[in-house]
């Protein structure tokens, strides 16, 4: 606190990684203040156009934490509200223009990261770098793929389409976000416990974690319409998907980033007869290894939640 606090605050204020306007909210999202009382990670799915209603906040919305929203509200996904089925078609958030007292889409609704997500398909290593994207994976040496990423500020449905009645059947999508750690250099190793290596970060502000929804590898192709909204053609019906004019269409993965406490567990010494490599070329059972580690992680999560008397949903599990 005495030596780094002022510099840390200055770095957070000048960083493009945070979208919050108020200092306390931004510091809370960066892990320097507790998140209690700050609903800044909530994202809305707009069911009606606030510009037509003439007021904010809009009442015709469905709200989710961003960790859930990047899946549930992603373009093409359907949700049910008041016995009606709504389909998300793109990304938008709104703001009040004090100059002419109107409501308009935010210019940065898509919230594109200036740096790409560098990800290795072979071993799963990933990082969001500030400059000089990595070409080779530092873990396995294979080529890294560079992915455009964004953290949408809101989502919306086709306002011109009448929602269908819910008859018990709709397109449900299972969550497909992967948990990606981006704090390797800040993890401290502790004494081995029963052949288990334990590492964690000493400060929550050092624990950068990304939840990534890449649409099962197909990404989300979004372009900007003449109203400043970002729309996915694939989520629209014919013939609108072909006739709509969109600018600067590009593919993105959705990311929800946060700073938090991180705990990693691994096996210290492995018998030569057992291969735990996550790389398929080295281990044909790599998918089974991943499943086993994830099962272990969920078991540990359940034990921690029971011991601390918290909801298990407050803890995320990933294979890294």
Predicted feature descriptions by range:
Residues 1-96, 130-320:
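Extended, highly charged accessory segments
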Residues 118-123, 137-140:
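Short cysteine-rich clusters marking metal-coordination/redox-active sites
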Residues 66-72, 102-117, 124-132:
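Short, flexible, mixed-charge glycine/proline-rich loop motifs
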């Amino acid at each position: 606190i005495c030596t780094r606090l002022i510099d840390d605050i200055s770095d957070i204020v000048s960083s493009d990684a945070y979208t919050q306007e108020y200092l306390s909210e931004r510091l809370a999202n960066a892990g320097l203040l507790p998140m209690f009382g700050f609903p800044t990670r909530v994202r809305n799915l707009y069911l009606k156009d606030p510009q037509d209603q003439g007021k904010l906040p809009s009442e015709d919305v469905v709200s989710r934490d961003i960790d859930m929203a990047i899946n549930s509200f992603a373009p093409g996904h359907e949700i049910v509200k008041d016995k009606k089925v709504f389909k998300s078609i793109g990304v938008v958030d709104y703001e009040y223009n004090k100059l002419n007292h109107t409501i308009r889409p935010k210019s940065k609704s898509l919230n594109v990261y200036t740096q790409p997500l560098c990800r290795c398909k072979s071993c799963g290593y990933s990082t969001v770098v500030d400059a000089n994207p990595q070409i080779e994976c530092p873990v396995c040496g294979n080529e890294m793929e560079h992915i455009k990423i964004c953290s949408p500020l809101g989502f919306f449905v086709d306002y011109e389409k009448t929602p269908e009645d819910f008859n018990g059947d709709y397109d449900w999508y299972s969550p497909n976000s992967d948990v990606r750690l981006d704090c390797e250099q800040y993890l401290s190793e502790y004494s081995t416990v029963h052949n288990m290596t334990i590492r964690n970060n000493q400060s929550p502000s050092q624990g950068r974690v990304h939840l990534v929804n890449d649409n099962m590898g197909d990404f989300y192709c979004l372009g900007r319409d003449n109203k400043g909204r970002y729309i996915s053609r694939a989520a629209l019906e014919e013939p609108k998907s072909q006739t709509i004019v969109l600018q600067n269409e590009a593919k993105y993965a959705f990311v929800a980033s946060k700073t938090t406490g991180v705990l990693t567990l691994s096996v210290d010494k492995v018998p030569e007869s057992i291969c735990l490599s996550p790389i398929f070329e080295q281990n044909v059972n790599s998918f089974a290894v991943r499943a086993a580690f994830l099962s272990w992680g969920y078991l540990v999560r359940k034990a921690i939640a029971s011991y601390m008397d918290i909801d298990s949903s407050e803890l995320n599990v990933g294979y890294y």
